[in-house]
Swiss-Prot record:
Residues 60-64 are annotated as: G2. This is Elongation factor Tu. InterPro entries: EF-Tu_GTP-bd, EF-Tu_GTPase, EFTu-like_2, EFTU_2, G_TR_CS, P-loop_NTPase, Small_GTP-bd, T_Tr_GTP-bd_dom. It comes from Pediococcus pentosaceus (strain ATCC 25745 / CCUG 21536 / LMG 10740 / 183-1w). The keyword GTP-binding applies. The gene is tuf.
Length: 395
């Protein structure tokens, strides 16, 4: 008998659990898979499986992350849960797992704690725009007014970081009780999933976004012209499309794609994820260099100054052994090339220690095609010493 073909009929959304240590993120993740598995929508993962997250390397940084997947009636979800606080910080900054939305878990017994605040700040900085709150362990609080107070605090904290604190959905329950099979708490988990279905919008598909391809290599085909090759980051490109060559120079060059090749075969359309070569009309070999991008006209500009949210590797991770101060000049690796930049630390930060995460301003010596959300690594002598994401354009 022929195997059943997997139909990707439901829209796909990436989410994750965030919040303070021991507030119940992993227990909630396990409870979601258990409750949905009883409806045939997931494979139940127990706490120990999720907690023993495998190590992954993303841009030279080791991160522990657990991935589970499940479905609701409406959608397919990939859900990430990281065991340690440092893993969360690294995960959100490197974008190892891009989240479309997050479930903020706050124990009603404790209320918001330091990492609650830090995870909300990080979510804001790296562009996770939608948060649903789960007030956990409410079975351990006798007084409902105390839970109301915690909810109010969480809403205020979200508003402080530009989330719509008054409108964010807040659910109350006990992840542990749901995991143990308490019918009332299992219903709360289903309500949570319904809320996530409704509140967190389906992300725009990568192929629907404006075309962007970082240039990795440039070569000439005699008699035909100049080819720029690389992996398409987002969007799609068709033969005959106009593109701009952006970055590393003040001027933007406009050109038309007259041919697309992949694996030595010609293509009509290249899309996000494809490694292609694009033949560019009327462009000289020296007009395109590695580190520039090909982009849909008007979709991205060059900038020299930006704010970045950055994780600095610890000594054990192969990072620096000593702190750095303002005016530190490392290389910033954007897309496919290194550009030197000068770091300016915020007024309240005297120095940055290996293992810290920090927001700082960078002024690059050459203009680079970047926007809010562009990922980069910080390098020194060819070694990665940090990873970051552009949180704001400053020039």
């Amino acid at each position: 008998m022929a195997k059943e073909h997997y139909e990707r009929t439901k829209p796909h959304v990436n989410i994750g659990t965030i919040g303070h240590v021991d507030h119940g993120k992993t227990t909630l993740t396990a409870a979601i898979t258990k409750v949905l598995s009883e409806k045939g929508l997931a494979k139940a993962s127990d706490y120990a499986d999720i907690d023993a997250a495998p190590e992954e390397k993303e841009r030279g940084i080791t991160i522990n992350t657990a991935h589970v997947e499940y479905e609701t009636e409406k959608r397919h979800y990939a859900h990430i849960d990281a065991p340690g606080h440092a893993d969360y910080v690294k995960n959100m900054i490197t974008g190892a797992a891009q989240m479309d939305g997050a479930i903020l878990v706050v124990a009603a017994t404790d209320g918001p704690m330091p990492q609650t605040r830090e995870h909300i700040l990080l979510a804001h900085q790296v562009g996770v725009d939608y948060i649903v709150v789960f007030l956990n362990k409410t079975d351990l609080v006798d007084d409902d007014e105390l839970v109301d107070l915690v909810e109010m605090e969480v809403r205020e904290l979200l508003s402080e970081y530009d989330f719509p604190g008054d409108d964010v959905p807040v659910l109350r329950g006990s992840a542990l009780k749901a995991l143990e099979g308490d019918a009332e708490q299992e219903k709360v988990i289903m309500d949570l999933m319904d809320t996530i279905d409704e509140y967190i919008p389906t992300p725009e598909r990568s192929t629907d976004k404006p075309f962007l391809m970082p240039v990795e290599d440039v070569f000439t085909i005699t008699g035909r012209g100049t080819v720029a090759s690389g992996r398409i980051d987002r969007g799609e490109i068709k033969v005959g499309d106009e593109v701009e060559i952006v970055g590393l120079k003040e001027d933007v060059t406009k050109t038309t794609v007259t041919g697309i090749e992949m694996f030595r075969k010609t293509l009509d359309v290249g899309e996000a994820g494809d490694n292609i070569g694009a033949l560019l009309r009327g462009v000289n070999r020296e007009d395109v260099v590695r580190g520039q991008v090909l982009a849909a006209p008007g979709s991205i500009q060059t900038h020299k100054k930006f704010k970045g949210e950055v994780y600095i590797l610890s000594k054990d991770e192969g990072g620096r052994h000593t702190p750095f101060f303002s005016n530190y000049r490392p290389q910033f690796y954007f897309h496919t090339t290194d550009v030197t930049g000068v770091i300016e630390l915020p007024d309240n930060v005297e120095m940055v220690m290996p293992g810290d995460n920090v927001t700082f301003t960078v002024e690059l010596i050459e203009p680079v095609a970047i926007e809010k959300g562009t990922k980069f690594t910080v390098r020194e002598g060819g070694h990665t010493v940090g990873a970051g994401v552009v949180s704001e354009i400053d020039d």
